[in-house]
């Protein structure tokens, strides 16, 4: 198909698509380099379905990007709208955006991801299957350019891209590459008042699919490339992942008993974690296999020569798992210590950055 024919097809498709809005955040820039937001928005600007067709392209700016960067981006991409929202987390930013926009479909993407040109088209066109399609995700994976990134790809939570070509039902999504029918999302919101660092999406998927019987669709050609986290960020990310896996277990058990519960602010999960546990339960939760064989095999299958580099990546993989296990053990002893310590660190770094920004240039 030549370029003229392709343009005609896309124009015809645009006429049949539901109205949509795009919600974007800056909170994830805390885990990667600032340059990522430029590459991310550049990839979105080159979509086959232009972001200018959206009712809104709304950036929820929590202050993770300098004001001059946001101003520069708004000048370059006039279809951007910015909503300032200080002291707001990742999931709160997403749900705030969903409430503010007006499209029938709300599309979520992140500042640390780059998207293939067909990404938005494939996500939106999947909704044309019928009104029963409520959630459509794309596939997200990480780049592999060195040994560290090979370790991330073999142990982090983003799998490699599948070899599928058609949309398929699934029970999971990543919030950096997913779209919802807006009314459905507002009726079944992503929980934001959970005592977790990350993992709200996992629990949202559990709620939607296991408890409520809904289905998530995934389009394998709608691909997002996620920038691997920096080595400084992965330290705390791994510790807190060990903490979060305990909390997720308790939240699931609470949800099983009360599937309609949406406000966890009154639930004292710390008290549940503090209860006496058998040594067997603690060891089973803490010490898990550090090697995710399925992920490792998919990394090698994608490029067989990586098998020779894998031994060099193993120390990183073991380090990540040691951190997770350490986070789990600390949480059994002092349930909220890790989260409180991390928040204090973040607050101190934020205050230091404000002081630097306020200092007159020499």
Q: Which sequence ranges carry the predicted segments?
A:
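N-proximal low-complexity "stem/linker" segments adjacent to membrane-targeting elements
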Residues: 1-43
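Acidic donor-binding segment of Leloir-type glycosyltransferases
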Residues: 41-84
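Non-catalytic, C-terminal membrane-associated alpha-helical segments of glycosyltransferases
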Residues: 239-244, 260-362
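Glycine-rich, basic loop-to-helix element that forms the pyrophosphate-binding segment
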Residues: 85-101
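A recurrent flexible, glycine/aromatic-enriched loop bordering the glycosyltransferase active site
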Residues: 161-180, 195-198
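Conserved donor NDP-sugar-binding/catalytic core segment of glycosyltransferases
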Residues: 118-150
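Acidic donor-binding loop at a coil-to-helix junction in glycosyltransferase catalytic cores
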Residues: 196-207
């Amino acid at each position: 198909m030549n370029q003229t024919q392709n343009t005609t097809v896309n124009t015809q498709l645009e006429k049949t698509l539901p109205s949509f809005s795009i919600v974007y955040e800056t909170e994830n820039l805390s885990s990667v380099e600032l340059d990522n937001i430029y590459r991310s928005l550049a990839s979105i600007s080159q979509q086959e379905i232009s972001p200018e067709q959206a009712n809104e392209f709304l950036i929820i700016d929590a202050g993770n990007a300098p004001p001059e960067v946001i101003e520069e981006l708004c000048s370059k991409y006039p279809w951007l709208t910015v909503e300032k929202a200080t002291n707001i987390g990742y999931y709160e930013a997403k749900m705030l955006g969903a409430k503010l926009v007006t499209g029938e479909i709300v599309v979520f993407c992140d500042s640390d991801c780059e998207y293939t040109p067909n990404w938005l088209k494939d996500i939106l066109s999947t909704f044309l299957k019928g009104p029963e399609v409520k959630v459509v995700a794309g596939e997200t994976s990480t780049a592999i350019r060195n040994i560290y990134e090979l370790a991330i790809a073999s142990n982090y939570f983003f799998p490699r891209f599948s070899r599928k070509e058609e949309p398929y039902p699934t029970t999971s999504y990543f919030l950096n590459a997913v779209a919802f029918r807006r009314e459905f999302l507002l009726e079944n919101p992503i929980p934001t008042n959970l005592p977790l660092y990350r993992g709200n999406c996992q629990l949202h998927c559990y709620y939607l699919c296991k408890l409520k019987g809904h289905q998530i669709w995934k389009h394998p050609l709608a691909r997002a490339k996620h920038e691997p986290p920096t080595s400084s960020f992965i330290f705390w990310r791994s510790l807190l992942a060990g903490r979060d896996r305990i909390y997720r277990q308790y939240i699931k058990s609470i949800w099983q008993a009360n599937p309609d519960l949406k406000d966890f602010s009154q639930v004292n999960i710390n008290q549940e974690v503090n209860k006496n546990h058998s040594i067997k339960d603690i060891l089973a939760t803490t010490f898990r296999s550090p090697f995710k064989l399925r992920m490792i095999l998919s990394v090698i299958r994608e490029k067989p020569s990586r098998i020779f580099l894998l031994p060099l990546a193993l120390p990183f993989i073991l380090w990540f798992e040691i951190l997770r296990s350490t986070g789990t053990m600390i949480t059994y002893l002092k349930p909220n210590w890790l989260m409180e310590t991390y928040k204090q660190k973040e607050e101190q770094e934020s205050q230091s950055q404000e002081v630097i920004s306020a200092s007159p240039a020499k």
